[in-house]
Amino acid sequence: MKAIILAAGTGTRLMPLTKDIPKPLLEIGDISLMERMMINCISSNVNEFIIVLGHKKERVIEKIEYLKKKYPIKIETVENKMYSQTNTSFSVKLATQKLDDDVMIINGDNVVDERIISDLLKIKETALVVDNHKHLNEESFKLRIEDNIIMEIGKGIDIETASGEFIGISKVFKDDLPLFNSILDELVAEDAQNYYDLAYKELSKKAKIRYFYTNGLKWTEVDDKKDWLYAHTLIGEFDDG
């Protein structure tokens, strides 16, 4: 099992915080978002990581060297040299194309209850983490699931018909990787600005996908300053136990 952490984006909605560092290196309590996610993974015996680099890659590489000395982990890097013209479908494609093992895919700005990671890893098949508890809005990356198949995925889905929100954390079973990579190739060819999340819509029609529902376990994705403030609150709660 390896964990891919997507750290290539520019984080424009958090400027000026992200002017000199990418979002995953933003710190709360002297610990970066990326390190906090790695700690969650290490707690579940995931010790191998692939970090996708892009915006301010030198800062991420510097942090990686520090983390490799601090924890018993292995870290590979993949550079998305076209990070400013592409999106997560391209970044994930770069990271997964040579893998032959189960892999988690994690947005680099995720802050989550560690039980989300540990419970996801108990599922042996390809699986997505879906928040079925949070109040949805127009910005939520929603899914509509019927008979275990993703009928729709994206922000434009009717809130009333949505099954929940995809939180940006998933796991691809190694046997599904060839098909997953093929779908990613098609997404990138269609539009390099596509999100990798869209690959699961097609994959769900041809492979068995499980859905881990958060059932109230807390998380956030740090997209803007409101999220950043909420992340501070969450981490305070997590650290207090």
Model-derived segments and spans:
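Short catalytic helix/loop segments, enriched in acidic residues and glycine
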Residues: 20-35
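N-terminal nucleotide-binding beta1-loop-alpha1 segment
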Residues: 1-19
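Conserved beta-strand segments of alpha/beta enzyme cores
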Residues: 24, 74-76, 208-210
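Short beta->alpha linker loops
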Residues: 29, 55, 83, 195, ...
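Conserved N-terminal catalytic core of the sugar/cofactor nucleotidyltransferase
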Residues: 2-5, 31-102, 190
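Short beta-strand-to-loop acidic/aromatic patch adjacent to the donor-nucleotide binding site
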Residues: 101-111
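Conserved alpha/beta core of the MobA/IspD/sugar-nucleotide pyrophosphorylase nucleotidyltransferase superfamily
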Residues: 1, 165-241
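Conserved core of the sugar-phosphate nucleotidyltransferase
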Residues: 113-189
